[in-house]
Amino acid sequence: MPGIPTDTALYRRMLALGWVEATTEQVMHLDLSDFQYPEKMREKEREMAENGYFVDWYREGVQQGVDEMVESLNNSMWSEEIPPAAHGGMRLLVGLEGNTVAGFTGPVYPEPTGRGYFAGIAVGPGFQNHGLGSLLFYKLCQAEKDCGARYMSLFTGINNHAQNIYKSAGFETKRYFAVMIKEL
């Protein structure tokens, strides 16, 4: 469902006509020229490595379980894009427990507009609460910058706890969008 910018006359008119907000999304933006991989993440990497968790580029035949991890997320868009990207040699960052894929972000490449593309970021249900999401996201920002992207943008729900990771990496909310519904 498309969202309606909440700072527009259309949004106010729809409210007046009985439409209500089902959910609110925010668009967030980061100018990558300002991004620096922080020392606190290097420390986190060392701590996580001591517990067997790493982030690295996906390597076919070396790491295992990418298909199963993506399937466990129950997201049809990711199921259609991420396994083919991984098996097709695209640049995909993965969170690992040993050699088992525990999370992903990417594929990583700059779009012609200069925007750093990524389909999403997720950590599988059995691997959450170890810091992989934060580490994957910071590694993603650095990888996008390194491959020539000038900025990154994303949509996320206003109640999504991951927005705290995005904000800590320097992302700023630029606009809010309401997904509107109306009973007929």
Positions of predicted regions on the chain:
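Conserved active-site tyrosine of GNAT-family acetyltransferases
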Residues: M14, Y166-K167, F171
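Acyl-donor-binding surface of acyltransferase catalytic domains
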Residues: M1-A49, A178-K182
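A conserved beta-strand-loop-helix scaffold within acyl/acetyltransferase catalytic domains
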Residues: L73-P125
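Short glycine/proline-centered loop/turn elements that form peptide/ligand docking sites
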Residues: F137, N159-A162, L184
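Conserved acetyl-CoA-binding loop-helix of GNAT-fold acetyltransferases
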Residues: V123, N129-Q142, D146, N164-S168
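Conserved GNAT acetyl-CoA-binding A-motif
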Residues: M1-G3, E144-F155
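Short amphipathic alpha-helix that is part of the acyltransferase structural core
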Residues: E25, E39-M77
